[in-house]
Amino acid sequence: MIIKKPIFWDKKRPDLLSIILLPFTIPLIINNILINFLSKEKSKEIKTICIGNIYLGGTGKTPFTIKLYKILKKLGHNVVVGKKYYKNQYDEQTILKNETTLITEKSRKKIIDKAIKNKKEILIFDDGLQERKIEYDLKIVCFDNQNWIGNGHLIPSGPLRERIKSLKKYDAVVLKQSMDSEENKEITHEINKINPNIKIFYTYYTPLNLDMFDL
C-alpha cells in the first residue's frame, strides 16, 4: 500500500495539525527507546554496512547503495546487497537486482546467513537502521537537503522515524545537495552539533540517457 506523504510534514515549522498529532508519536518514541536497550548481535563472519534513513521518504539511499556496491566491487571485494522483502517495494528490489548481486528474505538475519553461506566478504543492507536484532559494522544515514528533516517531528506528526539526535549513534551521513550552498552549510553545522565525529559525504544526481526520450 502506498501512503501519500502529508504536505505539513515538510513545512519548516510545525503547524497546528502536527501539534495535534504529537500524542500519537508516543508509541514510536517508546519503540525507539526499547530498540536502544535491546541486545543486538554483530556477525563475526561478514562485515555489514547499513544504508538507511530516519526521514520517511526519498533520500537517495538506493542509488547510493548501488554506487557503494560498484565501488567496493571495483576494489576487488566480494560484496553483496541485502534487502528485506516487502511486497510493496517491488520497484526498488527490481532496480537492485538489475544493478547488483541481491539477496532478499523476509528477515535480515536470514540475509546475513545466506551471504555467509555464499562466502561473501561484505554485505550492504538497503534500509534497516531501525532493525532490533542486528548490530551493523557501519551505519550510514541518507538525507535530501531539500526536505532535510521536514518539521522535525516523529511520525505521524512529522516525517521522522527517529529524532534527529539519533545521529549520535550513527557513523556517517550522506547528504544529497541542492544548489543552495548556504543551506548546505546550515545542515552540516546542525549535524556536527549533534555528532562532531560523524563523517559527512555530499552527493548530487545527474540524469542519464535522456536521448532515449523523444523530447
Describe each region flagged by the PLM:
Residues 77-79, 139, 200:
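Hydrophobic anchor at the start of a short beta-strand
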Residues 36-88, 180, 212:
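Walker A (P-loop) phosphate-binding motif
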Residues 2-48:
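A transmembrane-helix-recognition feature enriched in membrane-embedded lipid enzymes
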Residues 1-17, 40, 73-78, 117-119, ...:
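Short, Lys/Arg-enriched, disordered terminal segments
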Residues 87-195:
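Phosphate/Mg2+-binding loops and adjacent switch elements
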Residues 52, 83, 143, 177, ...:
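Short beta-strand/turn micro-motifs composed of small residues
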